[in-house]
Amino acid sequence: CIVLAIDAKRLAVQGESESVDEAVSDGPANISSQSRWGVFTHGGRNATTLDAVKWAGYGADLGAGEILITSMDTDGQKDGYDLELLRAVSDSISIPVIASGGAGNLEHLYDALNEGHSDAVLAASIFHFGEYTVTEAKQYLADRGLPIRPPTSP
């Protein structure tokens, strides 16, 4: 399976510091005046002309099996995922979406799957620093009625 990873950032809206119209170009997934999130590279430092939601759809059309969508606005903040971004991507394509960027507790995982319509969640810091175990996360989600593969024994 090929996973298309997208690093997305919210774009300035009309009247804010930078206009989306400055980045408009001709490609099938390029930014337009209606774009809410752009695709960024180099850890969110370099902008592209791609609209994140359109790019996810185009990637699916080209054969990607899953989309890994990371909000560069919430990544590392541990304040929760960008649920609006997740819903926009998840609701626009038919392949699985993996949420990334923002998990600070187990409720955030649930929110990304439930409110964000994601199919899976990526979490790093909450596991790296021993705040939760993968087993605890799976149990939390299962207790809330989400279909979860049972934990395997070490």
Protein language model annotation of sequence segments:
Residues 4, 67, 89, 112, ...:
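Conserved, mostly hydrophobic/aromatic
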Residues 2-6, 67-69, 97-101, 119-123:
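Hydrophobic faces of well-ordered beta-strands that scaffold small-molecule active sites
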Residues 49-53, 79-88:
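Charged helix-capping and loop-helix junction motifs
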Residues 111-152:
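C-terminal helical cap(s) of enzyme catalytic domains, especially alpha/beta-barrels
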Residues 20-29, 33-35, 85-87, 114-117, ...:
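Short, hinge-like loop/turn segments at secondary-structure boundaries
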Residues 48, 70, 75-78, 98-102, ...:
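Glycine- and other small-residue-rich loops at beta-strand/loop junctions that grip anionic moieties
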Residues 1-68, 73-74:
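Conserved anion-binding
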Residues 12, 84-121:
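Catalytic cores of alpha/beta
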